[in-house]
A protein has these predicted regions:
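Short, basic-rich loop-to-helix N-cap that marks the start of a DNA-contacting helix
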Residues: 54-64
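Helix-turn-helix
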Residues: 40-41, 46
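Key DNA-contact positions within bacterial/archaeal DNA-binding proteins
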Residues: 34, 45, 55, 74
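Short, charged recognition helix plus adjacent turn
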Residues: 2-4, 67, 75-91
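A short, Lys/Arg-rich alpha-helix, primarily the initiator
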Residues: 2-28
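Short basic helix-loop element that most often maps to the first helix and adjoining turn
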Residues: 20-39, 64
Length: 91
């Protein structure tokens, strides 16, 4: 919407919903943070920081995370959307 400012998303309810979705997917895959990081070719701190809400996950990272979790990115995204305040407002 023109003229409307986007609020900061880090540590917002919607960001928390994304983190919860990704943590749940990692748990369902039976992976530790280190195992997921190894699959991504990243340090364990990369996973820890987004799971602790210290950093955002961009779209490209979301797709890479989905692949590393052997999860369908569309299914994960839908799970995220159905749990967010922003999506519920637009329905």
């Amino acid at each position: 919407m023109p003229g409307q400012r986007l609020r900061k998303t880090l540590r917002s309810a919607d960001h928390d919903a994304l983190v919860a979705t990704l943590k749940d997917a990692r748990d369902q895959a039976g992976l530790t943070q280190q195992q997921l990081a190894d699959r991504l070719g990243r340090p364990q701190s990369f996973v820890a920081k987004y799971e602790n809400g210290e950093r955002r996950v961009d779209l490209i990272e979301f797709v890479a995370l989905s692949a590393a979790l052997n999860a369908d990115p569309m299914r994960l995204f839908k799970a995220f959307l159905t749990g967010t305040k922003a999506f519920k407002k637009t329905r």
